[in-house]
Every structure is written in C-alpha cells, then in structure tokens.
Amino acid sequence: MSVIELKDITMSYGPNRILEHFNLSVEQGTFLTMIGSSGCGKTTALKLMNGLLTPEQGTVCINGTDISHTDINELRRGIGYVIQEIGLFPHMTIEKNICYVPNLYKSPDKAAIAARARQLAKTVGLDAEMLKRYPSELSGGQRQRVGIARALMNSPKIILMDEPFGAVDEITRKRLQEEILRIHEELGGTIVFVTHDIKEALKLGSRVLVMDQGHIIQDGTPAQLLKHPATDFVRRLVAG
C-alpha cells in the first residue's frame, strides 16, 4: 500500500521551476533516501508531503487521502518531522521539548506522556537524567537525538527527515545512523530521508531516489545504483 503519493506535481519558487510533472509513490515500511544536486527539489518534495507547501499543480496523498481535503494540523500530528536545525525551545527542559506536541493538544494523561518521553529518550540513546537538562547543556548530537524523540512522540507511521545529521561530527553521525536504522527496524513505519551524502543514502535506504533539476534520475535499491547506474550523473555520484 502506498502511504505517500505525489501525483503530477509542479512547483516553482518565483521564476524557478523546482519540480515539474513529478511523481513519487512510497510504500508502507519503506526507508526511502533522497539524494541529488543542490536545489534539485528534495526538500521541496519533503515539505509537500506534510503540507508545508502547496503545489501549483498536482495532488499529494497521504494514506490514500488528498491532503488538500484534510485538516492540516491533524495531518501533521501523524507525521514526524526532523530537520538539521532541530528547533528545540531553549527555555524548556528536554522532557518538555519531547512532550511539546501532545501538551500542545492538551492531552489529559500527563503521566502517560511523561512515561512515553522517558521511553523515547532510552530509544534514541539518551540517559534519563538528561530529560531535566536544557538544550544548551547538550551536545549537537544529543540535541539531534532529542529532535528524533520529539518526532516519534505521537507514534507516527511516517517520519520525514531533512538532512538531520548534517550538522554533527562524523563519529556522531555514524552513531545516529545506527540509531535510526535500529528505530526503523524496531518500530516499523515509513521514513523519507533527504541527504547530500551518497554513503549515507546507500547505507540507510532500502530504496534510493536520485534527483537532478526537479526530476527523478534513478529509483532503486542501493545495489541497483551501485551495479547499474542509470546515467553518468548517477555513476559519478556513487563513485563518491
């Protein structure tokens, strides 16, 4: 079953056409990584998926429903979203940052929310004592883990990740990659992960999408990209 569908999407920023007649379907349980040249439309596609952008033409469907006919806030409650600049609230403890969305919607069971936050902290590799700290007291890698925990708080079936590990050092990045693979294996769901790092795309993705100038150049497994690159652009990309 396709949980994400972008159908005949056209999208521009001013005079610049970013996506043109763009089509993408993502099946339940897929870990899709998206990679390509700067400005090729990866982030735009991601923002269309959770309604941050509205296409000029075409349809975005989540779980079979055209999102233009749904409550956008309700849609986003069911989608985890992780970006490079995590956007934690500096005046809130880590626990309150993780619990922000359910508290925003005034969920009545505060004890269950707190227990869920502790569980997720453990899931992403954070010690329980860190929940009482503030973002400024954590390293970049730790803050990124908080961002992932916050995205998981509502048990979303879809997680969108836009270069989430781009601002951390190489050792931390590798640890976070292992964590997100483990989380995907444990919790299931569908992940769409934008990256500029081909090694990361090939390591994480069960399916890898290569884009250039608003078009899909190749869509396949990591092995297919490595063994049978569709174009010179893909060949240069996988060669590193």
Give a label for each model feature.
Residues 110-129, 182:
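Conserved ABC ATPase "signature" region
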Residues 134-138, 142:
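Conserved ABC ATPase signature
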